[in-house]
Amino acid sequence: MRETIISYAFLAPVLFFFVVFVLAPMIMGFITSFFNYSMTSFQFVGLDNYIRMFKDPVFTKSLINTVILVIGSVPVVVLFSLFVASQTYHQNAIARSFYRFVFFLPVVTGSVAVTVVWKWIYDPLSGILNFVLKSSHIISQNISWLGDKHWALMAIMIILLTTSVGQPIILYIAAMGNIDKSLVEAARVDGATEFQVFWKIKWPSLLPTTLYIAIITTINSFQCFALIQLLTSGGPNYSTSTLMYYLYEKAFQLTEYGYANTIGVFLAVMIAIVSFVQFKVLGNDVEY
């Protein structure tokens, strides 16, 4: 009995902060999504906010942009991180540490510093990207990467990718260290090709890490906000607006808290569904 009380005593602070700062806001957000909640009114409107949301062309545009970011970033992050980790793992300790530092640097660098660097790279007049492309005769005139609706979302996605691969690479390198080397050597002695060794031995061992990386990258892509706020503010013409940015715009710029919470509920449901699908697809073969 005493041990149970002590256990609950240690858990109490964590549970308190979880209830106050996570669970309660989630419940309140869901409840207020059924209200016309702003600085001047608090009126129950039922499903009107949800009906308005699905008829809102800006919401539709933001949803499409969000889906593009998720589909474009998750597979690339997983495959690129796996490739780099597999190449890095076989290097010596010094080279491995250097590559870890290089790829993890954007992760620990503040988002403001990252956006300042990329803003200079993308600058239409003095940016290094336009300079390199023009010098290589790939383009004939400067491109406004963040100001052109045809290029802005791709430019954001590239930044998102560069800041998302650091942690997965480190995780994959660590996971590769846990692969049973005797199984790999035995398979090679039996005449297995490198692809067979990877697919039959290494890949099953890397599945738990892959599942974690896929889910975390998906959530981060759905919640992409800081880059967009600092670089494009959702423009031009909402071409880079995501659900997270549109939620912020409605809540903190237009003070339409009820409608913003409706978008938040939809976003949470989308993340839950996609994560569940990923878990079912990748998790069935995971051995813990």
How does the language model describe each region?
Residues 3-288:
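A structural signal for multi-pass alpha-helical bundles of membrane permease subunits
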